[in-house]
């Protein structure tokens, strides 16, 4: 199976403390808690993690068998006392996610290998979220959603976020939007668990201290029937960040709040990683308070854990960067691209369509004195909740205006229905698709 041969490393992100001592001090654990407060100039500070018995660090591992977070999570899921990078182990899956692009193929493989009348291993652990090709009249795209709907009815899948009225997404209370953001908002991302999904950006969920990675349709079809998968334990790269956060650094440049952590883990796959993981802390627990009632057990890397390599960054010296065509690693400092003409702007997707992202864009317009946009600017909220936030939350410093009001004032396009939009292309009637013989010279995406 494809996933068993992946040798890409895991990435562990550790923001160091700026003030005081945390519950996980260097004497007992190498972590502290990142927290952003505008009133203290965006300093990274440490806070006390809640002392709750069901959420204390897992006992898996010891000084004699020190492990990283990823190794501990996979050890728990494989019922092993210790794991080392390179080992292949059968891992019990806590959540399997699929969507309208890969779901039909995964379902087909499940039925072929397990039988036409086979039942999934656990109807409450499979999450199906249509999000890619939704607001289109393309018959094949619509058929994909029909296949998901039929399968969920047949299997009595508990978590199917369906959409039937594509003309008005708000008429579909079950519909959420982009799977990676919806998974978090609906409480499916929990510390210490294993989440697999048929999408490369499934690693987004690592922001919650869980092992999350993308798999193919064949693997997903197997998980549907067996509830487990053969995985290779990856080596871990450790990233330590400290210093004061400059005002001009945004979510894609570093991790602070929960949504920004999701952005960082989301982009691990672009760096060649198998998964990214951030230690769960009070910020994580607070986010999950009203989203899940299921118990979970966070784990933390042992102080003696071995890492393939470690990188340290002084965030006070970081600058905004731009990924240029045609590869994510073709990067440059934003100031080096100041003379590049931009043809279109697209704010959206799983990495840039969260509430924090639209807030950041709106604040820039406020700071500019509400200057009009000079190029077409498309807006695609990731989920229904984000769409509502865009229309309801006041933007600081705007006198009470919402993001939508500010975007309208400066000439942006009306926020579209929540989905993956143009990120993956799609049928000809996909929102923001050019449908022209020549591609745009330079499109700026947030």
PLM regions: where:
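Fe-S-dependent hydro-lyases/dehydratases of central metabolism
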Residues: 2-446
């Amino acid at each position: 199976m494809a996933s068993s041969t992946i040798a890409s490393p895991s990435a562990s992100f550790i923001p160091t403390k700026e003030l005081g001592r945390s519950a996980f001090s260097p004497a007992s654990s190498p972590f502290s808690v990142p927290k952003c407060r505008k009133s203290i100039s965006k300093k990274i500070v440490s806070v006390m993690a809640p002392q709750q018995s069901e959420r204390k660090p897992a006992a898996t591992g010891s000084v004699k068998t020190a492990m990283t977070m990823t190794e501990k999570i996979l050890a728990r899921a494989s019922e092993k006392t210790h794991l080392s990078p390179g080992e292949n182990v059968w891992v019990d899956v806590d959540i399997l996610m699929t969507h309208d692009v890969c779901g039909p193929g995964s379902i087909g493989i499940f039925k072929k290998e397990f039988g036409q009348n086979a039942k999934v291993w656990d109807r409450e652990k499979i999450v199906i979220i249509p999000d890619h090709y939704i607001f289109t009249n393309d018959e094949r795209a619509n058929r994909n959603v029909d296949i998901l709907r039929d399968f969920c009815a047949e299997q009595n899948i508990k978590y199917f976020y369906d959409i039937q009225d594509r003309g008005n997404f708000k008429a579909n209370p079950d519909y959420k939007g982009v799977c990676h953001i919806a998974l978090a908002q609906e409480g499916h991302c929990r510390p210490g668990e294993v989440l697999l999904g048929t999408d490369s950006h499934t690693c987004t969920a690592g922001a919650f201290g869980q092992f999350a990675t993308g798999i193919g349709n064949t693997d997903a079809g197997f998980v549907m029937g067996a509830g487990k998968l053969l995985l290779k334990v990856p080596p871990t790269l450790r990233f330590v960040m400290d210093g004061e956060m400059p005002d001009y650094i945004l979510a894609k440049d570093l991790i602070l709040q929960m949504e920004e952590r999701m952005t960082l883990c989301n982009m691990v796959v672009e760096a060649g990683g198998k998964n990214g993981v951030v230690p769960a802390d009070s910020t994580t627990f607070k986010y999950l308070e009203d989203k899940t009632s299921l118990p979970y057990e966070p784990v933390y890397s042992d102080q003696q854990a071995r890492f393939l390599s470690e990188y340290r960054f002084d965030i006070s010296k970081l600058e905004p960067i731009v990924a240029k065509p045609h590869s994510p690693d073709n990067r440059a400092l934003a100031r080096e691209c100041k003379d590049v003409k931009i043809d279109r702007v697209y704010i959206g997707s799983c990495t840039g369509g969260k509430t924090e992202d639209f807030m950041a864009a709106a604040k820039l317009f406020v700071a500019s004195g509400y200057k009009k946009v000079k190029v077409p600017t498309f807006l695609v909220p990731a989920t229904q909740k984000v769409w509502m936030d865009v229309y309801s939350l006041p933007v600081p410093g705007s006198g009470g205006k919402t993001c939508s009001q500010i975007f309208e004032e400066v000439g942006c396009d009306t926020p579209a229905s929540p989905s993956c939009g143009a990120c993956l292309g799609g049928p000809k009637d996909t929102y923001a698709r050019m449908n022209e013989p020549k591609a745009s010279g330079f499109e700026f995406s947030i």
